[in-house]
Amino acid sequence: MKQTSLMLSMIIPGPDSLGNDVDVYLQPLIDEVLQLWKGVETFDASSKMEFPLRAALLWTINDFPALAYLYGWSTGGTYACPSCGPAAKSFHLKKGNKMCYMGHRRWLPQHHQYRRQRKLFDGTVETGLAPETMSGTTVLGMLEGKEFVLGKKVPTTKQSNKDVEVESVKKRKRSSGEKKNQTKGSSGKEKKPEDWLKKRSIFFKLPYWEHNKLRHNLDVMHLEKNVCENFIGTLLDILGKTKDGLNARLDLVQLGVRENLHPIVDSEGKQSIPDAPFTMTRAQKEILCSVIQNLRTPDGYASNISRCVNMKDCTLNGLKSHDDHVLLQDILPVALRSCYPSKEVMKIVVQLANFFKMLCSKVVDLSELDKLQESIVMTLCDMERIFVPSFFTVSVHLMVHLVEEVKLGGPVQYRWMYPMERYAAAFYFNYHFLFLTTYI
């Protein structure tokens, strides 16, 4: 995403993005990286001599959707977690019609009391162990005997290009009795874990790529943003962003867990949902929003977050990634104290703030990383006890793998998307400048 490589970014616009076909445009890059691996004669100005310069590609920096295009592993559905792979644990919520990624008790010690508590979690006793991160050798083993053809659908003589575009955009309509099943293909057969591999990544042409421990980074910037928006949307009960609701409570009924949160049916047959530990009253929401609206920060510390506050509806909208970064780590733990939420929710928010603070610190203490991993596992398990299953999107689950990536790749400042987004600003400016000059 540097200035010299902006042309590569310009070929991936809009809904007709390259997707898995991006390997076609990455081929020149791979050829150069292979050449650097073998060695390139380079002149040393200090010694006045030539030497063979060698270089290797450590990893890729990308957001989560782009990881699917570079890796080839689909980041949606049952096995959406690229680290867990076939060992991912998830299930489909029938009423909410979405996937739930729980099962974090597997990372707890074998005799921890949470493993035996059915009713407080997903209704099962957890006996499994934490899965190992899927290696490059495992991925290549799953690709054996498979052939993939890159390229878009070519229109036939009877079908124009316009018809193909309309067909690709048109969505299939479901009948009222048809249910979405994330684990079945178009033929109705049960999907296998290896079906989540959509291609053989072009990076495996590099002789060392199979043995790299960390190949594609999980983007801490967007994961932190998604987690923060889950909390804000659920606590403030923002329409379209909250993870709680009638369907979420009906999923608890189907799972047979946490009867105190099940919907209540009155004498007229109307359903209402009881207050949960994370439910806030109108007065509490107003206090929280007023604290954020009246907040004043040092120059350069954060943007004007007060512009995102709507006091009439008690909502927060239009937050940028860095706004969520500051909110989750520094503002939200303090602001929530003023509106007196439940102790369980307050504890979770403080633990998450401390987790991301230590994770994003410039200096990493290796002796503290094991404790940090234990703390995020306990926090995720406490979240499973309090929040509804629909809260646990794949971004929430991926937090359990972030400490391991710090051990392998070092501080997140060298591996997240903030620098890339800043480089992209130049591209957006040039694009709009050219657009305006066309009509002036």
Where are these regions (language model features)?
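Domain-level cores of phosphate- or acyl-group-handling catalytic modules
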Residues: 1-278, 317, 344-346, 350-420, ...
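Helix-boundary capping/turn motifs
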Residues: 1-2, 263, 280-284, 293-307, ...
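Boundary/linker elements of alpha-helical solenoid repeat scaffolds
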Residues: 313-314
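Plant-skewed but cross-kingdom recognition/interaction modules and surfaces
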Residues: 335-336
